[in-house]
C-alpha cells in the first residue's frame, strides 16, 4: 500500500509541475569588436575646496582622456593621456598656477616673555628631633634546618598471569633526599 501511495503522489506532482521553460535568446551578451564610449564629469565644491574634472573617450582600442585637479599648493595639475595597442599608455602632466592663488607670507617670530612675580621666600626654623632614639640594630640568626631520615619508597606489584604491554621508554630515577633550609618537600 505504501508503494501505491508514493507512486500516486509522484504522478500528481509531475502533472502539476508542467514542462520547463525554453531558454530565451534575448538575454545573451554580445561581443562588441569595436567598442565606443565617451564620458566626462566636473566637481566644484566651494565648501571643501575640492575642484576636479575628467573626460575620456574610446574608439576601438584607442583611449584618449584628460583629468585635472586643484592641488593644495595653489596649482592646477592637468594630465592628458592616450592609450593604444601600439604605443601603450602615454601621459603628459602640466602644472599651472591658479589665478586666485594665495600669497604665502613668511611667518615672523615674536618673542613672548611671561611676566612672573616672584615672592620672597619665608625663612622657617630648622627641624629639631623630638628625642634621641637609639639606632636600629639588625641581627641575623642561624637558619633553622629540619632533618629527617632518608626513606626509600619501594612498591611491589603482585604477580599477574596476563598483562598489557605498552611500548614506551621507562623512566628510572634514584630518590635522593637533600637538606634545604625552610623548605618542606615530599618524596614519592
Curated annotation (Swiss-Prot):
Pfam families: Chitin_bind_4. Residues 49-62 have a biased composition (Basic and acidic residues). Imaginal (anterior) epidermis. InterPro entries: CHIT_BIND_RR_consensus (IPR031311), Insect_cuticle (IPR000618), Insect_Cuticle_Struc_Prot (IPR051217). Residues 34-100 form the Chitin-binding type R&R domain. One of its GO terms (cellular component) is extracellular matrix. It comes from the Eukaryota. Residues 24-41 have a biased composition (Polar residues). GO terms for molecular function: structural constituent of chitin-based larval cuticle; structural constituent of pupal chitin-based cuticle. Residues 1-17 form the signal peptide. Keywords: Cuticle, Signal. Residues 19-67 are annotated as: Disordered. GO terms for biological process: chitin-based cuticle development. Component of the cuticle of the pupa of fruit fly. This is Pupal cuticle protein Edg-84A. It comes from Drosophila melanogaster. The gene is Edg84A.
Amino acid at each position: 500500500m505504501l508503494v501505491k501511495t508514493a507512486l500516486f503522489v509522484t504522478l500528481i506532482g509531475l502533472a502539476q509541475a508542467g514542462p520547463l521553460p525554453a531558454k530565451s535568446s534575448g538575454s545573451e551578451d554580445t561581443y562588441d569588436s569595436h567598442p565606443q564610449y565617451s564620458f566626462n564629469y566636473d566637481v566644484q565644491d566651494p565648501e571643501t575646496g575640492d575642484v576636479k574634472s575628467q573626460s575620456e573617450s574610446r574608439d576601438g582600442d584607442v583611449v584618449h582622456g584628460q583629468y585635472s585637479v586643484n592641488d593644495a599648493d595653489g596649482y592646477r595639475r592637468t594630465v592628458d593621456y592616450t592609450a593604444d595597442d601600439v604605443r601603450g599608455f602615454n601621459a603628459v602632466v602640466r602644472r599651472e598656477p591658479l589665478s586666485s592663488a594665495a600669497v604665502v607670507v613668511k611667518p615672523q617670530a615674536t618673542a613672548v616673555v611671561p611676566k612672573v612675580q616672584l615672592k620672597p621666600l619665608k625663612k622657617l626654623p630648622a627641624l629639631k628631633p623630638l628625642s634621641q632614639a637609639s639606632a636600629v640594630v639588625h641581627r641575623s640568626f642561624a637558619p633553622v634546618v629540619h632533618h629527617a631520615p632518608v626513606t626509600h619508597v619501594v612498591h611491589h606489584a603482585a604477580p599477574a598471569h596476563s598483562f598489557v604491554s605498552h611500548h614506551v621508554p621507562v623512566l628510572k630515577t634514584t630518590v635522593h633526599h637533600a637538606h634545604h633550609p625552610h623548605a618542606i618537600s615530599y618524596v614519592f
